[in-house]
């Protein structure tokens, strides 16, 4: 792994299981760290709200801050109508955040570095928003494909462009998240490998530089969870407004 910065993204089997309908369903490192991320989220929420104190402790305050943060994102982008969709938006945010942060830890695996994972998340969001759109607005939901005031002669072209833009939303969401996680981790691995090979890791400047890079990657991990969530809310606003 020290020689190949992309080795950290390799999926390998942890527990081999019998094939199911011809498909390999073995328990992989990706499954393991996804499970770890979910368990950490559950523990964070359970212990955070366990006491329900009027004057919250540090953990309860952290849970309340994350929850209020997600609510503010929803309100700012969808208005009050979007608040009924808090369960989905909060789950998406906290899951991606947990996976991203776990991936920063040494010898871990970044689940969100694989497009298949981020695309699955994006498709869940895409299908959910589409269903909500038709449920809330009916056929009127299709008006997002044709802005008001569009000349009739231009309408067919605009509809095709808007339909294409709508259908590629899950693709852009998934690639944006995966690409940013891959890029950040690869840069850290390349620089860290160079420093180790030069035998200068424990000198002050390179060591502090690596720490700063890891700190920046933590920031990117949080930022990417925020961007995914805010884009989800922007797309949701088309369905509820």
Swiss-Prot record:
Keyword field contains Kinase: no
Q: Does the keyword Cell membrane apply?
A: yes
Q: How does it sit in the membrane?
A: Multi-pass membrane protein
Query: Keyword set for this entry?
Result: ATP synthesis, Cell inner membrane, Cell membrane, CF(0), Hydrogen ion transport, Ion transport, Membrane, Transmembrane, Transmembrane helix, Transport
> Where is the protein localized?
Cell inner membrane
Record GO terms (molecular function): proton-transporting ATP synthase activity, rotational mechanism
Recorded hits in SUPFAM superfamilies, A to Z, give:
F1F0 ATP synthase subunit A
Q: Which Pfam families match?
A: ATP-synt_A
Q: Which family does it belong to?
A: Belongs to the ATPase A chain family.
What is the recorded function of this protein according to its Swiss-Prot or TrEMBL entry? Key component of the proton channel; it plays a direct role in the translocation of protons across the membrane.
Spell out the PANTHER family in the cross-references.
Answer: ATP SYNTHASE SUBUNIT A
Q: What is this protein called?
A: ATP synthase subunit a
Q: Organism source for this protein? A: Wolbachia sp. subsp. Drosophila simulans (strain wRi)
State which gene encodes it.
atpB
């Amino acid at each position: 792994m020290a020689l190949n910065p992309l080795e950290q993204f390799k999926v390998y089997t942890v527990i081999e299981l019998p094939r199911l309908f011809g498909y390999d369903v073995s328990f992989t490192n990706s499954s393991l760290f996804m499970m770890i991320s979910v368990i950490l989220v559950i523990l964070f929420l359970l212990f955070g709200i366990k006491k329900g104190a009027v004057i919250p402790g540090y953990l309860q305050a952290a849970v309340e801050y994350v929850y209020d943060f997600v609510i503010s994102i929803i309100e700012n982008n969808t208005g009050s109508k979007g608040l009924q969709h808090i369960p989905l938006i909060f789950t998406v945010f906290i899951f991606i955040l947990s996976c991203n942060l776990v991936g920063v830890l040494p010898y871990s695996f970044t689940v969100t570095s694989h497009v298949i994972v981020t695309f699955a998340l994006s498709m869940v969001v895409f299908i959910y928003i589409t269903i909500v759109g038709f449920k809330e607005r009916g056929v009127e939901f299709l008006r997002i494909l044709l802005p008001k005031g569009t000349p009739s002669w231009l309408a067919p072209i605009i509809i095709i462009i808007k339909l294409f833009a709508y259908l590629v939303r899950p693709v852009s969401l998934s690639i944006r998240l995966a690409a940013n996680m891959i890029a950040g981790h690869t840069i850290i691995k390349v620089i860290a490998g160079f420093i180790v090979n030069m035998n200068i890791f424990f000198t002050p400047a390179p060591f502090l530089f690596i720490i700063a890079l890891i700190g920046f990657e933590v920031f990117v991990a949080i930022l990417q969870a925020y961007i995914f969530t805010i884009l989800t809310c922007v797309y949701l606003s088309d369905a509820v407004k």
